[in-house]
Amino acid sequence: MNITDYLVTKRPFVILILFFACAIVPNFIYAQDMMGKTGLLKLWDGLKQKQSEELMPHGKALYQTSVRKAKQNIPTRLIPVMENEWIISDGWELGTSTQVLESDISIFSPDFNTTNWYNAIVPGTVLTTLVNQGVYPDPYYGLNNMAIPDTLAHMQWWYRVRFNTPKESKGKRIRLLFNGINYRGEIFLNGKKIDNMAGAFVRGKYDVTSYLKENGENVLAVLVSPPDNPGISHEQSMLAGQGLNGGQSSLDGPTFIASVGWDWIPGIRDRNTGIWQDVRLQIGGDVVIGDPHIITDLTLPDTTKAMVKIAVPIRNISNNNVFGELSAKFEGVNIKTAYSLKPNEEKSIVFDPKDYVELNLNNPKLWWPNGYGAPNLYHLELEANTGAISSDKKKLQFGVRELSYELMINTPAKANHRIAYTPADVNNGQPIFDYENVVLVGDPKKQRTIPTLYSNVNEEAVFEQLSNDDPVGQYLVFRVNGVRIYIKGGTFGMDDAMKRVSRERMEPYFRLHREAHFNLIRNWTGESTEELFYTLADEYGMLVWNDFWMTTDDTVEPNNYDLFLKNATDVVRRFRTHPSIALWCPRNEGYAPQGMEPRLAAMIAKEDPTRHYHGNSRFLNAINSGPYGFIKDYERYYTQIAEGFNTELGAQAIPTANTLRKFIAPEDLWPINDVWAYHDMHHTTHFFNDFMDAVNSYGQANSVDEFAKKAQMITYDTWRRMIEGFNSRLWQNTTGLILWMSHPAWPSMTWQTYTFDYETPGSYYGVRKAQEPIHVQMNLPDDKIIILNSTRESYSNMTMTVRYYSIEGREYYSKSAKFDVKANAKTDCFIPDIAVDKLEDYTLVRLELKDRYGKVVSINDYWKSKAKLQANKELNKIRKPKLKLVKVKTQGSILNYELQNVSKELAVAVKLNVKDKLSGEIVLPVYFSEGYINLLPGEKRKLTLELPHQSIHDFNIIAEGYNFDSVILL
């Protein structure tokens, strides 16, 4: 067999080099071995020394000053989570290891003097505390991050808290739970060492009954150490260019590898060291409930019946035989079973639908991804009793849904062929796909691969055979509840650069994803791995593509495989009940290292056999990542870039002027300078010059306000076009797109849909428009109009109308036709039959789709000219319009308005905001149904606004647009 037909590799791009360099290469090649022997590739491990001063960023504004707060005597609170569980809150203190060494009194003594320490934020990082306490300025503002020393990542820190033992614990066992420490933690309770923890994502669970005082204060102290390899951060500037991606931090494996700095985040000075997740006390008896595993199975294609299987690990932590009862309750179900445990024995109690008729659900409320149905959740309560005493309780939520997948594979018995499989139906606890032996398909230059199978896999028993005639070819397809899901994906590079991840802070971001019609979020390199992330994904209908903590395969890899696997195993066990998690992936843009790959695959097959483990985020049943910047010829999105499944595609995303002022000082707002570069304005890459030419095609920008306004026109269209390109080939080649990125980790100029402050600039509304569940669009280059229906419902007798308007608002062409629109499919309409020479110099093309009852379902506007970008200055000829806003009605928290253009001028790119009357500040987050819309003379548009519950009640609604400045409407 020829190498180009059957080439197996861990590193396709390296093998291509070998292919052209060698006359004969064996069919089965392990590229990593060859790299070690040939020295063809040196893995990236970051900077070896700091940049020179001239390459550092410099601004006109001084760093902001900070004033250290006086330390307060804050009492500890035990906040109840359940009747048997408390979060240890407040009262935490932070000091350096040097301060402890210099003290004459033991840190474990209640009399230890912490006057010169800091009131600590737990959960939180060291830097979060130091910024909160006024030691350092806000690192997100300007160049303030440069004022914070990198030595924070080279220091050990002590966390300390005093608390009283809960009265409810009398006669019971008390357990101490750490949900996450980065990177190492040495735990002491009342002077006695409890344990060491290592890795940011493993929990520490300890029986501390014998360590606690029944009366008086307990002292809990934790010595926290940063990652072993903090590396040297590259500082972005106009001279230094964009950030270098990671480096030595990747050696540490289970940590926040991006915190050393990337091309979208600066080096975080403490590398997110600290007790970054909460600490809890739990009381109970001798039997402890572990991490349950819930498997839901549908009798597809029938979705009216579901079987729920619940496996519950329980462990006897005593030296005595124990007898008891385990109960499980959720909506409409209440079951129990007896158990017996020998001393220190652990076993799994299984509630099987074969034995419990209650677990055979009729008409279950299914969990669906956003846009395909409601993300319904069930709420499970588990309780282990010993006699009449409750020994342990656990509450969690789960969803009834079934995941399956389509992809192409290669086997010796059968060449490249397409299959579908449902992991839960296989459920044999063994890996299926051999990612150490993958096969190049198609053009070798494109490096695309498909997996082979392990030799013990019975293909006929595992897979449904699909037709190779399906135009989606080798590409990955997700199914939920038997329905193909067209992936509209976003990416969290990191939830927050300082790991401030409260529900209050994070939930609006998920709400914005839902409103923009996303149905998947990629947890890039596992940087956002925490309970709240998955809980919000469950609640908002977001599938999760979950990476582990490794980046591209040209970067150094973890030193300690055992530590990596320990953290990964705990993550899988801990979060496997979340219906949102759709896929596990070992790393970003690469395969797991040899030696780790089989262990990781085996662990996932054992601990979570209901989900697909996908060996690589690019190339494997997918295309290459990118591009990442402005594409001046939008046709390329349709004719070249839109193909298959892409996990990374993005562009510049400039904030509004109001947002820019939140993180850049007035002195540095204009022109573009080092401060902009530090905040990810990549002026040397990603077609930056083309982007600037496009912005200035509306006329040279001479201020930050002009630049931001014109940039919104470009970013709206760019992000819309990249998605519409993929839309244009729905299920006829493309199966999904994951944007790089949808979420910013800090104030940024690129790779985001919304901005850090919850503002929704042009990029957001461009994405929201293109991802509408029912969407009408005009393709390039032929102007064909199509309807995209990414729902489970079909619609008959829909009317699609296209109209061409001059910049004066005069209609000069129109055409309508009726169409039946199938579910989860693309419907071709027509190409407008207007000759090029009949086009006005600059035209507003409006597509309008109505349902059979005349209700508008989708409106989509395009600016079209014979001269392309060169004609954008025509918009500057349009005079200022006059708008009127009328409140129609209120439905709960939703306010309904009618916006009307009462002038004879076009209103271009109209965006509404809410302004606090008292402070004059823009109120965020708020949720408008539309943004950057065009209003024809006399046109009315219905809009909705939803304000968060805590928002102000005395506000104005303001509007701004391309051809007018901000005005108060109401």
Spans of features found by a protein language model:
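Aromatic- and acidic-residue-enriched carbohydrate-binding clefts of CAZyme catalytic domains
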Residues: 141, 425-435, 439-441, 486-492, ...
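Secreted/periplasmic carbohydrate-active enzymes, especially glycoside hydrolases
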Residues: 1-17, 29-488, 493-496, 500-520, ...
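Short, conserved micro-motifs enriched in small and acidic residues
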Residues: 369-372, 709, 713
